[in-house]
Each structure stands twice: as C-alpha cells, then as structure tokens.
C-alpha cells in the first residue's frame, strides 16, 4: 500500500545543462539581445531600477516648501526619464542573471556601494559581502537610503518627504543592492566570494510560448512583439530557439552532494524564493506576476508576456519575436528549440517549487520511517515548460522520474498550465479565498475562459492518479490548484481512500458564493473522504458554505453528508520540525552572523518582519502602527530599528508607493539617519542562515497579515528565540493565531492605536514575563509539528474512509431505480416527515412537485395554524398536523383523533415531574402533550425522570389507547396509531377520488368531517366522491427520520408494495437509523430533496 501525494509541482524536476565550450552556446548567445550594446543612459537607468523595490514608483511632484525626498541614487535629469520612457526592451541588470540563481543566492553577497552599472561588472569581484552591512564601522558610504524611487515615465518628480539629511544609512546595503556577479559560491558550498568561478556549465530552460495567439487580453504584447519583429527582421524555421541561459544553481554533480529532498524554509509553502525573477525569466512554472496585485503568498508565479504590465520592458529574441497572425512561425520555432533540447544533456535535480512545508513534512516522515520511503509516490507537473522539449526526451525524463524518484509527472501543454494556474488559480481563485474578490469588469469572461483549463488540468491529475492507483493505496491531494481532483478520482475509483488538504484560508459563504463555479468546486472537494483545513474557522466556513450552496447536511460540526457519502471535515495545522531547526541554529555560519548583527545594532531593539510583498500582509498598516509608536515614544527613534524583509517580485506600484512614503516619513524622525535609521526596508530575501541569525537576535517579531493560512515564519522565529525569548506580535487573522494565542500578543492590524501599544508592550516586556510566554509558544510548536500533522492527517483519512466503507454496506437509495419508478407511474403520492421549518429551497422543490400533479403531504408534530403558516407558499400542498391527528385536504381539516379528554389527567402527572426537574416544562396541544427536558438544570437526572413519566402514563392510560414515547429527549403523549390511521385515510381517499386536486368543485370541501359523524362509528371514512375511478395510486414514497411516528408508515408502504396495491413503494429513512422498516437510506434531508429535485426535473 502506497501513499500517493498529488500537488501542483513534483519535488524533482529536469534540468538541461550546456557547456559553454560547445557549439550550442553560440546559438544561445545569439538568440538574445546583446546587453553590452546598451546605451549609457540605459545602464544608468538600470542601476536606478535595481534598488530596494523591484520596480520604480510613480510619485507626485513635491509641494512648495516641502523638502524633497532623499534619492537613493544619483539625481536624474528629465531627459533621462524621457529616454527611459521611449525605450522598449530595456534590459536591467537582473536580465544578466536568471531568477533561479537570484532566488537561491539570496543575500550572501550583498555589496556596500551602488549596484554596478558598468558592463565590466560581469567579471568576478572579490570580498563583496553582507558582512560590511553588519560591520559597526562608520566608514561605509552613505549616499543611498530607503526612499521612494521615481517611475521611468515620470519626468523627474519626487515624493514629498520631510527628510532633511542627505546621507545614507549603511543598512541599505543588506540585500538592497545585490552584487549580481556574486551568486554561485553559497549554492555550491564554495567559500570564495566570487561567483563566476568553477565549471562553465549553464542551465538552459525552455521558454513557455503559451498565449502567443492574438487575444484581447494580450493586445499590448501583440503590438510590442510586432515592433520587435519589424526591427529585427523575419524569423524562419532556422531561427534559434527561445530559451533562457543562466548560471547553474545546481549542477548534476552538485546535486549528488545533497539529498534530493533537501530541507526548504518551511514557511515557503510555494517557495517564495522562486518568486524573485528577472523580466526575462520564462520558465512556465517560475516567474513573476507583475499584474497580479494580490500576489499569492508562498506561491510560484508563471510569467507570460501577454499578461505582463504594459510598462514592463521586455527582451525579445534577436530574430524578431513571434508571429501573431500565423501558427507556422510558432511551430517553426518549436522545431528549432526541439532540435536543441534533443541534444542537450539533462539531469534530475531537486525542485525549489511547490509546497515546502508539505514536502519537508513528508520527507521527515520518510526519514523517521513513519512513511516507508518506497511507499510514497508523487504526482505533479515537472516545473518547466514542455512544448519545446521533444516527445522522446519528455518520455525519457518521465521514465527517469518514475523509476528513480517515484515521481509521476503530469505533462500538459503550456497554454493549459498557464491558463489554469496563472489565470484561474492566481487571479480568480486565490484572491477570493483570501477575501480579495476580483472586481475587474472583464473578470467574469476571464473566469469563464480560464475555468475550462483549470478543469482540464485537474482531469489530467485525476487520470494520472487513477493510472498508478492500486487497491489499498491512500490518495492525498493538496491545495486549491487541485480542488476538482477528489471527485474526478471518485468517479472512477468509488471505493478509493482519498484525502484533501487545503493550505490556504477558506472564506465565509458570503465570499465564496461570488465564484461562478462555486458548486462545482465544492462538489469536487466532497469527493474526498476527508477534507483538512489549517484552522477550525476555515473548516466551519467550508461546512457552512456546503450546507448553504449544496444543501449538504452538517453533523456534529465535523461531518458533511452529501451525495450518499459522509465527508469528514477536520482542522490540523501544518507545522515545522522544531528539533531539526534547532540543530541548524548551531551551525557556525549562523553563529558568525549573530555576532555581526549584535555588533552592528549594539544597544538597539531589533523588530524583525518577513512577509510576502502583497496587500494581504498588512505591511502598510504595520508601518503606520510603528510610526505611531515612535511618535508617542520618541525615545525609541534612536533605540529601535524595524527590519522589514519583503520577498516575492510583485509589481504593485501603488502599494510600494504607499509603503515607501511611510518609510521615508518614519526615517525622517531620526536626527541622524546615517547613524540611526528606524526602518530598514529590504525587498529581497535573506540567505537562510542570515535569516536564522536575524530571527535569533530579534527583540520583537511582527506578523500583521490581513488574511492568511498558517504562517510558519513565526513558528521558526519562536524556535530561533530560545535565548532571548522575544515576544511575538501576531495578527488575529492568521491561521497561526488560533494555535499560538496563549503565548503571543494578538493584534488587529486595522487597530493602529492598539497595534502601536502592543509594540511598546513587546519591547518593554521583562524577561521573567517573556520566558513563560515563550515556553507556551514552544510547547504549541512542538505539539503541532510536522510529524503530528502527517500522523493526524493520514489517520483521519483512514478513519473517514473506513466509516464510508461500513456505511456503504447499508442498503442505499438507488436513485436510478427511484427515477425509473417515478417516470413509469401515473399517480404518485409523497409523504415527508419534516420536523424543522422549511428552507426556501424546499419550498421551491415542493412547488415544482405539486405543479406536476404529484400528491404531496407534509407531516410533523406542529399544530395546525403553525403548519399552515410554514407551508402557505406551496400550492396544493397537503398537511398532516400533530403526528397524524389532523389531515388537510384541499384546505379543509379532517379529524383523525377520537378522544382528547385525557389531557388534563396527564398534565397533572407531568406537573409533578416538572417540580422534580427544574428547567423542564410541558405544552398542551389539541391532541397531544409534550414534556420538554432539554433545558433542565440537572441533566444527570433527566433519564430517570423521563423513565418514571413514561412508565406512569403508559400504566394508567394504556386501556384508553393513550401512549407516551420519547424522541430526542422530548416525551410525547397522544392517541396510539394516529399516523398510520392518517396514511390509510389518504390511501382510501385518493384511490377512490376521480380528481382530488380539482378545486373548482366544492364537493370535497363540503364533505362532513369525521368529527361530525356519529360517535358510534369506529372507523373514519374518507370524504365521499360523486364518481369513482380505477386510477389508483401506483407510486408511494414515505420519507423521514426513524421515529415511533414514522415507522408504521414505512411498514405500510412496504406491505402495500408487496401485496401489489401499489406498483412501486419506497420507504426512505435519513439520518442515523439502527433499526427501521425503511428499505432505503439517504444521509440527510437536504440530500433527499436534492435527489427529488433531479427526479422531477428529468
């Protein structure tokens, strides 16, 4: 038995390598625009754009009398901006280095001066390091600070800021200006500070050509590529392929030196490291998303040129771009690329893409033998575009992944992947799940278009799973990219063991119902035996949404009954391996970085934050709270520093402008910004050892997300803070807040005042108070680590599947048989026992039933007036009140009950019971008495009091035909056999009436009621009819939960069917029934009405 793990990306991917000495290298070089031929002004602009942020900002001109903001680079003239705005295809320094290297290098080689602009900077440089940033030396250049940069199309305008100083704080050198020539040594465990040392291998990555056909969404791209084609000449079949050339982040030889499932920062669910990419990056599964303003956290991005911002510059192939009028050029380019990739050597390397927390957890479980290694099979995409790779090479790659790594690739064309992942997942589904409802006027058409690709991708995953599945295997599907897969697999494998885990938040029903495909997504999830969430809140939202939109029945707040199956809905937070992280903290490099940090910020309080750069992280609100804190506590301007690390390459210009205005405003509070900079804003991630060191030295860690799943960054901080026991400020809107609320300081990011006060509280908290709080946090981290998540999730999947297997042995309702019987019959009668008030959906279905000539009756214990009010909106509905005592025919009530004079005597008995059981009470209706004990103060005595009452009443009134019974802790006392008498009354009437629903005739309504007949008559007779028809009822259906009232009706229908009195009889019970006369079963009332609605529609 194997564990089949399905997620968007496999933990391994193919990597094509190219030796620069080979002839193919000249092809690669010639296919790209020559960067060294760029003009000097373009090089200057490139240096400006490569700053704290990944894109320049649009800023208004400063008002008169307000000091201008301090520039982070040399002053540019308006002409420079004009030249920049008129330049297309401008390559930035990032273009010289691929995103793969850029992501993995992080900050081990930060420079201490400006980002080089000279083309000679491609040569190796020595001794460039972040150590200069951490150095306490005051001889560091201070010509640049964290302040908003200008947009290329803004003629020299600047953001107004009260900053007066024209000096630079050395902290800006930490990761703000990464030396792009120092990128390899940390990846290959090289101690050298130079990058371009070592072998001459390069990685060649296929480029996605998805979306090259002309579409309305890609108009701007079409224009740009046409211009590029015109200026570069025509392209033919012999043109070089469109590929990416980068310095290898992991060569085949280097891959052998580290485990293939290497540890990843567990907070990077979808590897935020992979989000940092240059504008040229073209890997299908790893690119920036400039237009996605609600950038997903922990997620890879696919960058396709037609979806990029119109202001983004592009480097197009030298041979002239793409043809948008004919597919011939595209196929010619593909053939050219395939020729190259058919000759390039390739290897399988670990992938940095995908859910890092999930992969780390499974890897740990394998190492600890919780899951046998050979019993884990991975299903996912290969992580690179596949259109340009020849089919035989893809087949070889697939075989290698299957045979050596137990990884089964899902191969899909680039168009499908791009539309499903980037378009639907990233721009429709992910924002909605995080309460960011897309409001673009074109989003509806966009959503409908991309949905079919999302469904297609999910179907391919389902097919791949079915292909490798063997009896006894466990299928575990992960995250919102694959929400349709569970039901798709269930359709083919009805008895498979299937689990699904959602790693992001799940919104309330009011938000989720905004999705056009909401029912299809929910039905896809209900195909699983188990659906797991990160918090109780998200699980509750899913249950409520399913109940509201699917009319699924919810049981005990942890089960969902739908479509004949029970879905277990639980919450189990994913965690980290705290003990493994503790061992990494003892590494020598971490200790060295900690020493440098202590020397650099000696005597200062460090506030550390690490967030994805998007709107839901609350970065702007965090800075506003910090600003308010400094204004109200000015002594902390020189005593504290907030280091904000932003990861990802989102191009949200407006958000960046807002943030940088606040940053400048805060830094202007310092009297000498070159010595004391209150805010250090870094739009780039740290090396993991640096990140651990900084977290270990932090005096406060702040998470201010406006909505998030499980934030594992704060989990790692807790482990890192073993020495200092620093407080954690945690947003109440993160999944981690429900887990860490005992030890963390919970904040509301929108409450700026309390947020700022919480910062002061955290910084001034003494050690004797911090220590107990930290112990609570650490205990929660250990108790909810990755191992616990794996064990609990797999156990829940198995238990849920086992329950469904046992439940499947009960004779379930055969919907097909019910439909056939319904369609073949002419006169049909339904009796529903419904104890709760009807929903609007029930009312609608009942109206549909009665409008099609069906005889429909509702029976319950409600009095006549209440029952009439509840179902007044249903035309021609029949009613049976007080469990059969009264029957309504065409608006006229008929008495079935014989005697009611016993009620006062029974009431005297129950008065004594009420005195003995405070909180209980009884109600007297027209034909019955109810004794309620649900609100009794002493619940331990309820059972004994109920037993005494039933025994007393049945002993005294048995000879009078009065009986007491208990149902759901409510004692009901009434005449025996009323429900059965009412049903027999209806059968006799409708088997004799020519047209029982003919309201044009007053003959039925004027019939004498049973109560007006001679008291000596022992049997109630149905109202007479002037004509008698042989058109008897040939279809009878009785449904409800098992109870003493309904069981006689189940038996009656079965007897009528067995004796041939009705052609088809169906006795359907819903809910939990241990012993019943019913022969068919559904999970709940909502499911029953869903089946009924399908039958009457067909």
Swiss-Prot record:
CDD domains: GT20_TPS. GO terms for cellular component: alpha,alpha-trehalose-phosphate synthase complex (UDP-forming); cytoplasm. The modification Phosphoserine is found at residues 49, 53, 56, 71, 77, 135, 147, 161, 229, 303. Residues 228-242 have a biased composition (Low complexity). The keyword Phosphoprotein applies. Keywords: Cytoplasm, Phosphoprotein, Repeat. One of its GO terms (molecular function) is enzyme regulator activity. Residues 144-164 are annotated as: 2 X 7 AA repeats of R-I-A-S-P-I-Q. Residues 59-86, 129-168, 192-244, 274-297, 1000-1027 are annotated as: Disordered. C-terminal 700 AA are mainly in alpha-helices and beta-sheets. Regulatory subunit of the trehalose synthase complex that catalyzes the production of trehalose from glucose-6-phosphate and UDP-glucose in a two step process. May stabilize the trehalose synthase complex, and confer sensitivity to physiological concentrations of phosphate and to fructose 6-phosphate. Present with 1960 molecules/cell in log phase SD medium. The trehalose synthase complex is composed of the two catalytic subunits TPS1 and TPS2, and at least one of the two regulatory subunits TPS3 or TSL1. This is Trehalose synthase complex regulatory subunit TSL1. It comes from Saccharomyces cerevisiae (strain ATCC 204508 / S288c).
């Amino acid at each position: 038995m194997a564990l089949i793990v399905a997620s968007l990306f496999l933990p391994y991917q193919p990597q094509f390598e190219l030796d620069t000495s080979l002839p193919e290298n000249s092809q690669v070089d010639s296919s790209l625009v020559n960067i060294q031929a760029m003009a000097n002004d373009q090089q200057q602009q490139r240096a400006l754009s490569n700053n704290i942020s990944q894109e320049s900002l649009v800023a208004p001109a400063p008002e008169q009398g307000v000091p201008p903001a301090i520039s982070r680079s040399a002053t540019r003239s308006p002409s420079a901006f004009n030249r920049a705005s008129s330049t297309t295809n401008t390559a930035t320094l990032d273009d010289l280095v691929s995103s793969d290297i850029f992501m993995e290098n992080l900050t081990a080689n930060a420079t201490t001066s400006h980002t080089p602009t000279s083309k000679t900077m491609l040569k190796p440089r020595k001794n460039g390091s972040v150590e200069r940033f951490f150095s306490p030396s005051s001889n560091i250049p201070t010509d640049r600070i964290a302040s908003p940069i200008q947009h290329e199309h803004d003629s020299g305008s600047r953001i107004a800021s009260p900053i007066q100083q024209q000096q630079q704080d050395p902290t800006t050198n930490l990761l703000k200006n990464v030396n792009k020539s120092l990128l390899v040594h940390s990846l290959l465990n090289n101690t050298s500070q130079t990058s371009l040392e070592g072998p001459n291998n390069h990685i060649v990555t296929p480029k996605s050509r998805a979306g090259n056909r002309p579409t309305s969404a890609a108009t701007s791209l079409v224009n740009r590529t046409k211009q590029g084609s015109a200026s570069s000449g025509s392209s033919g079949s012999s043109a070089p392929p469109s590929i990416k050339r980068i310095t290898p982040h992991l060569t085949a030889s280097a891959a052998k030196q580290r485990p293939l499932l290497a540890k990843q920062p567990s907070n990077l669910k979808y590897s935020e490291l992979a989000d940092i990419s240059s504008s040229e990056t073209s890997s299908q599964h790893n690119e920036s998303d400039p237009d996605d303003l609600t950038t997903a956290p922990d997620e890879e991005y696919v960058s396709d040129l037609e979806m990029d911002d119109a202001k983004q510059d592009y480097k197009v192939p030298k041979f002239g771009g793409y043809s948008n009028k004919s597919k011939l050029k595209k196929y010619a380019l593909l053939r050219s690329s395939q020729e190259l990739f058919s000759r390039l050597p390739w290897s399988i390397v670990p992938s940095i893409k995908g859910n890092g927390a999930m992969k780390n957890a499974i890897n740990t479980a394998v190492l600890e033998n919780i899951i046998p290694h050979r019993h884990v099979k991975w299903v996912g995409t290969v992580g690179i575009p596949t259109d340009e790779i020849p089919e035989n090479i893809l087949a070889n790659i697939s075989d290698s992944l299957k045979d050596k790594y137990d990884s089964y690739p899902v191969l899909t064309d680039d168009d499908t992947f791009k539309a499903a992942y980037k378009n639907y997942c990233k721009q429709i589904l992910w924002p909605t799940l995080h309460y960011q409802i897309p409001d673009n006027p074109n989003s509806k058409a966009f959503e409908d278009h991309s949905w079919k690709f999302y469904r297609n991708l999910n179907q391919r995953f389902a097919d791949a799973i079915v292909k490798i599945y063997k009896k006894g295997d466990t299928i575990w599907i992960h995250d919102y990219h694959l929400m349709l897969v569970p039901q798709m697999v269930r359709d083919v494998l009805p008895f498979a063991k299937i689990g699904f885990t959602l790693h992001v938040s799940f919104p309330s029903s009011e938000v989720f119902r905004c999705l056009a495909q909401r029912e299809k997504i929910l039905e896809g999830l209900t195909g699983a035996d188990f659906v797991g969430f990160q918090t109780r809140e998200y699980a509750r939202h899913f249950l409520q949404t399913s109940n509201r939109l699917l009319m699924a029945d919810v049981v005990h707040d942890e089960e969902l009954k739908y479509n004949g199956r029970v879905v277990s809905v639980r919450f189990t937070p994913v965690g980290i391996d705290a003990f493994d992280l503790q061992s990494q903290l003892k590494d020598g490099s971490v200790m060295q970085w900690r020493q440098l940090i202590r020397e650099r910020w000696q005597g200062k309080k460090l506030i550390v934050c690490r967030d994805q750069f998007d709107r839901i992280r609350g970065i702007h609100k965090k800075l506003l709270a910090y600003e308010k804190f400094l204004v109200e506590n000015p002594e902390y301007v020189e005593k504290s520093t907030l280091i904000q690390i932003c990861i990802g390459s989102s191009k949200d210009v407006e958000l960046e402008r807002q943030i940088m205005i606040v940053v400048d405003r805060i830094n202007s509070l310092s009297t000498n910004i070159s010595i004391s900079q209150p805010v250090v804003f870094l739009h780039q991630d740290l090396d993991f050892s640096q990140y651990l060191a900084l977290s270990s030295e932090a005096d406060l860690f702040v998470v201010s997300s406006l909505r998030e799943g499980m934030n594992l960054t704060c989990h790692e901080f807790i482990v890192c803070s073993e020495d200092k026991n620093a407080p954690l400020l945690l947003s109440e809107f993160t999944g981690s807040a429900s887990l860490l609320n005992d030890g963390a300081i919970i904040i509301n990011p929108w409450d700026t005042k309390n947020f700022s006060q919480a910062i002061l509280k955290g910084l001034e908290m003494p050690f004797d108070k911090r220590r107990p709080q930290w112990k609570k946090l650490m205990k929660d981290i250990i108790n909810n680590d990755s191992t616990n998540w794996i064990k609990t999730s797999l156990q829940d999947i198995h238990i849920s599947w086992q329950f469904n297997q046992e439940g499947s042995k009960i004779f379930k309702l055969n919907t097909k048989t019910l439909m056939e019987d319904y369609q073949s019959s002419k006169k049909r009668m339904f009796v529903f026992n419904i104890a709760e008030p009807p929903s609007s959906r029930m009312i609608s279905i009942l109206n549909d039933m009665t409008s099609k000539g069906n005889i429909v009756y509702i029976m319950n214990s409600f009095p006549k007036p209440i029952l009439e009010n509840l179902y007044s909106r249903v035309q021609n509905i029949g009613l049976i009140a007080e469990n059969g005592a009264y029957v309504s025919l065409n608006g006229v009530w008929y008495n079935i009950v014989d005697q009611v004079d016993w009620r006062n005597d029974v009431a005297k008995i129950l008065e004594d019971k009420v005195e003995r059981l405070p909180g209980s009470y009884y109600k007297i209706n027209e034909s019955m008495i109810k004794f309620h004990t649900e609100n009794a103060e002493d619940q331990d005595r309820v059972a004994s009091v109920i037993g005494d009452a039933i025994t007393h009443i049945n002993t005294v009134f048995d000879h009078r035909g009065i009986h007491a019974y208990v149902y759901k802790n409510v004692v009901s006392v009434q005449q025996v056999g009323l429900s059965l008498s009412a049903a027999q009354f209806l059968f006799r009437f409708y088997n004799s009436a020519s047209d029982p629903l003919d309201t044009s005739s007053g003959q039925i309504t004027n019939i004498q009621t049973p109560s007006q007949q001679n008291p000596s008559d022992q049997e109630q007779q149905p109202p007479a009819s002037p004509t008698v028809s042989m058109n008897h009822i040939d279809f009878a259906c009785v449904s409800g939960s098992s109870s003493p009232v309904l069981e006689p009706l189940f038996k009656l229908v079965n007897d009528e069917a067995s004796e041939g009195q009705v052609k088809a009889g169906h006795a359907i019970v819903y809910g939990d029934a241990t012993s019943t006369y019913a022969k068919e079963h559904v999970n709940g009332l909502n499911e029953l009405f869903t089946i009924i609605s399908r039958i009457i529609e067909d």
